């Protein structure tokens, strides 16, 4: 479009130069005009006006096209603004409801947790204790977890560690007698809403997911991490869709390494560029 605009301006300039050149020569040098008239006959005026007319007509067509294109662009921008406004109205309403959902989750854990956890943060701290106890008492589980420390972990060992850790979370929740499953479902739906609404627009997805992430404590992010790899993180088709959403969009990138049960667990989310990774570790993050 910029090229067409430049062409139009150049043609206007050329037509103007032709017109003023003829006027200037007519006034300054009658002999030159006489020679031109001898060559072109009596039609020099028609020739010049016809040439200028064609140029200006072409220029007018270009400007009409540019005007139409500008109107289309303005119309698209207006639609995009309306689209974003509608989305943000729904999104921020859902985000405000999230606080109520989290509060209800804390109440449920406080009421039913057998370890006496008063909220989700304490529920996660108890899970860390449960993990350490299992590491110390179950050699097979300890071996599976230690495999994650290997630089080039085999696929079979990776899958075993992922399965065993997810199973451990399931066992912990069962032992506690509560999970606040509605909290995880709500977070899942909120994240899914953003991803599906802005499909293919990574920057927009990242912007709005950051709004959600910023409202969560480290312990909540930790619960999302391990809940997503457990049986409770599967969808109706037994697929780990929630984990995929979290990993593909680096939702957990700002979780601290101290929050994870083990630093090596970052390998369970191979596409996430965690903030605590060193330069060598960042090089192997899958895109």
Per-region residue spans from a language model:
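Short hydrophobic membrane-inserting helices
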Residues: 1-59, 63-66
């Amino acid at each position: 479009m910029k090229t067409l605009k430049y062409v139009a301006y150049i043609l206007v300039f050329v037509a103007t130069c032709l017109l003023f050149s003829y006027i200037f020569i007519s006034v300054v040098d009658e002999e030159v005009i006489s020679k031109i008239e001898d060559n072109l006959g009596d039609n020099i005026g028609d020739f010049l006006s016809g040439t200028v007319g064609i140029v200006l007509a072409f220029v007018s067509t270009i400007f009409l096209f540019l005007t139409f294109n500008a109107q289309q662009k303005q119309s698209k921008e207006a639609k995009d603004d309306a689209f974003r406004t509608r989305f943000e109205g729904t999104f921020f309403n859902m985000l405000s409801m999230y606080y109520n959902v989290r509060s209800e989750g804390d109440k449920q854990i406080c009421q039913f947790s057998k370890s006496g956890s008063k909220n989700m943060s304490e529920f996660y701290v108890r899970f860390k204790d449960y993990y350490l106890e299992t590491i110390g008492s179950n050699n097979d589980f300890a071996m599976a977890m230690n495999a994650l420390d290997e630089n080039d972990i085999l696929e079979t060992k990776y899958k075993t560690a992922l399965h065993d850790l997810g199973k451990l979370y399931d066992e912990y929740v069962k032992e506690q007698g509560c999970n606040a499953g509605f909290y995880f479902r709500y977070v899942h739906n909120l994240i899914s809403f953003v991803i599906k609404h802005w499909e293919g627009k990574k920057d927009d997805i990242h912007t709005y997911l950051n709004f959600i992430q910023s409202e969560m404590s480290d312990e909540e992010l930790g619960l999302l991490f391990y809940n997503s790899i457990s049986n409770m993180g599967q969808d109706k088709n037994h697929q780990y869709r929630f984990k995929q959403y979290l990993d593909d969009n680096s939702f957990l990138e700002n979780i601290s390494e101290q929050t994870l049960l083990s630093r090596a667990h970052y390998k369970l989310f191979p596409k996430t560029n965690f903030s605590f990774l060193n330069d060598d570790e960042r090089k192997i993050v899958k895109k």
